[in-house]
A protein has these predicted regions:
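Catalytic alpha/beta active-site cores
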Residues: 1-148, 163-178
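Thiamine diphosphate
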Residues: 144, 184-194
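Conserved, mostly hydrophobic/aromatic
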Residues: 156
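Catalytic core of soluble alpha/beta enzymes
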Residues: 159
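Cytosolic juxtamembrane amphipathic/interface segments immediately preceding
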Residues: 180-182
Length: 194
């Protein structure tokens, strides 16, 4: 914030290295920050259990990663972040590592329940964090893939309602599916060197 060179009126330079809290009155800046956090949408893909089970790419211990994930979820609760998923619980990678559709679903839901139990152990309310969880499944030509989403939703909703007393919003399992690269290779056996 030093003196400008002689002959420079400062136009165009005032924004360099200046943050919002320096440009705006503090109350307006805080309101924009608060409103942005309540409206922003997205997904954190930080499923440490999938990393350990399917990819073997953990750079942190499971305990540290769970604590970090719990910290992110607690921040979401404290700041009213309702439209951003704190974790995408991933079965896709488990399937790519060799699981069939049923095993993929079993491991993925088990991982989801592990996060639920961990967040509850930290004192979080099921109705505040469960809506911030999302799921990611693999899709292929096996007939079980046709129902994987419906089965997952039914199991999740019943467990969250009956075991954890979750409200309707918290019982909803949100997911997306991508085509399995592994299933595409099997269709072109002449090009598959395996």
């Amino acid at each position: 914030q030093g003196a400008l060179p002689k002959g420079n009126d400062g136009l165009g330079l005032m924004l360099l290295g200046v943050t919002g809290d320096q440009m705006l009155p503090l109350d307006i800046y805080q309101k924009i920050k608060r409103d942005t956090l309540t409206q922003v949408r997205g997904t954190v893909q930080a499923d440490i259990l999938k990393e350990d089970q399917a990819q073997n790419t953990c750079i942190f211990s499971t305990e540290f990663a769970l604590r970090l994930m719990g910290d992110v979820q607690q921040y979401f609760i404290d700041q009213g972040v309702r439209n951003f998923y704190s974790v995408s619980i991933s079965g896709y990678h488990i399937a790519e590592a060799g699981a069939n559709p049923i095993t993929q679903l079993a491991f993925t839901l088990a991982n989801g329940f592990t996060y639920v139990e961990y967040y509850l152990s930290r004192g979080m309310d099921i109705n505040e964090f469960a809506p911030n969880l999302s799921f990611f499944f693999s899709n292929g030509i096996d007939p079980e893939y046709a129902v994987i989403g419906r089965v997952a939703r039914r199991i999740w909703a019943k467990a969250l309602k009956n075991k954890y007393g979750a409200n309707d919003r918290a019982q909803m399992l949100k997911y997306h599916i991508q085509t399995s690269g592994r299933s595409l290779h099997a269709q072109e056996i002449d090009f598959n060197d395996i």
